[in-house]
Amino acid sequence: NTCQPTQIAAIALDGRNLKLKGTFNSEIRAEVDDEKAIAAGLGPIEEGALKVTGKTREQIAKAPQLKTVWKKFTAFVDKYNWKGTPFFAPIPAGFNIIGYDMKIINRLCKEFGPWDAKRGEQQLFSKVYKIDVMDNVWMWTEGDPSIKSISMDSLRERMGMSSENAHDALQDVKDTANIMIKFMKTHRAVYRNLKIDKVFANGELYV
């Protein structure tokens, strides 16, 4: 993924009670000259993206450098690595995080660290688990023919969330977190009454 991030935002949630534990947010300087960006192997900043975020090239050019912001961001994430090892690192969660954000994170970890050279992957977040809220929502709604879209904008409208600042990175993170928490609380409530022990012991399988 060659996308140039112009903002990094994240919140940390307690894995047990799902309460807010910390917040990170910073603008990032990106290469605003399209020719220079392409020459560096990066995607140029699209005018459509600027319209969505409300940012200008001038503002982006004055933001803190990516390397500086990344160092602060990784320090923020590491605060919540309770054993200080890659396998106990925070679980990354987001909307389409597997198909989009994690690709950028892998790229930036390879460039600035932390990077696992042996495995060829990032070493900032959990190596085992990832929570993609988009996939989660799809699992809940796939059997409902009335659902035409599960985009963030559609979910905001359906769930009665404000669309103000909807494409600011921090607001996106908060909105995604609220949706995730709602579904996780539902998961937990359903699981308490779910009977799965020896459910296939009678040999009645689906396939």
Question: What residue spans do the PLM features occupy?
Answer:
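Active-site metal-coordination segments of metallo-dependent hydrolases
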Residues: 141-145, 164-171
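Alpha-helix termini
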Residues: 78-87, 113-119, 191
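Acidic two-metal-ion nuclease catalytic site recognized across multiple nuclease folds
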Residues: 158, 170, 174-207
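Short, surface-exposed acidic
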Residues: 57-61, 116-127, 163-169
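Substrate-recognition/cap helix-loop segment adjacent to the acidic, metal-dependent catalytic center
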Residues: 100-129
